[in-house]
Amino acid sequence: MRMADSSLDAWTAFALGLADEAGAMLAKAASARPEVEVKPDRSFVTDLDRAIELRLRDRIADRYPDHGVIGEEGGEPVVRDLTWVLDPIDGTAAFIAGMPVYGTLIALMQDDTPILGIIDLPSTSERWVGVAGRPTRHGGRVCATRACASLPEAILSASNPDFFSAEELPALEAMRAATAWRIYGGACRAYGLLASGRTDLAIDTRLKLWDYAPYVPIIEGAGGIVTDWQGRRLSMQSGPQLLAAGDPARHREALALVEKALAA
């Protein structure tokens, strides 16, 4: 079912308000080193992660009680026809270390499809907003991916190589060998920069729904493509692997590289 523009406008305005609130909480706490807990999966969480998510969940429950919510730090996921997906601090390790690549990720899914996505980085005053069927905006202005003539000219971003399992490392190595430059550890900002035409490719693993859902409307609305490593469009059941490109032709080549590397 195609959503009315008025509904998309209302949800987008509401999501921007959520991002404003999360950003204010992050900015207020940025100067102090937070208390850190290591979760069972060895990732980090802080009291601020939980506080931000709880605040956003409360706002959603008040405004849209019939919507579902899935969050990284919250309780049991509630899935409805329309479901909000929250990552209160993407790049928690960077936040703990004071590196300004962390941010809040917000998405709205209609059934299995992300239709709204926000990457908000209060530390750099950057925000990317993607809405299905509309051009992506960075800082309020339309942004677009760039054409890339060949993989040997491409700039690749990737998460920490330590995140890749022994079985996945050949895919990363193949991408590293095929591209001109590599940038690691950019967290959510790396995907915003791809949407703005600053980088060309991104490869990741160990991702959950809240890590990737916002990227779909943001990258697609900027002219790019984002899938799993098999070339399938991302949905609620996807993960943990992601491959994104600003130029669809380079995405096809990268998929072939990854497939060959994993089959060797």
Question: What would you call each of these model-derived segments?
Answer:
Residues 145-264:
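An extended, acidic
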Residues 35-36, 61, 75-77, 119, ...:
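Short secondary-structure boundary/capping segments
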Residues 79-137:
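DPxDG-like acidic metal-binding loop motif
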Residues 138-142:
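A structural micro-motif at secondary-structure boundaries
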Residues 49, 53, 72, 87-90, ...:
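Acidic active-site catalytic centers that drive phospho-/nucleotidyl reactions
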Residues 1-89, 264:
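N-terminal subdomain of lithium-sensitive/metallo-dependent phosphomonoesterases centered on the IMPase/IPPase/PAP
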Residues 22, 26, 49, 60, ...:
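Residue-level signal for inorganic ion chemistry
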Residues 55, 103, 214-217:
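Short amphipathic alpha-helical face segments that pack within enzyme cores
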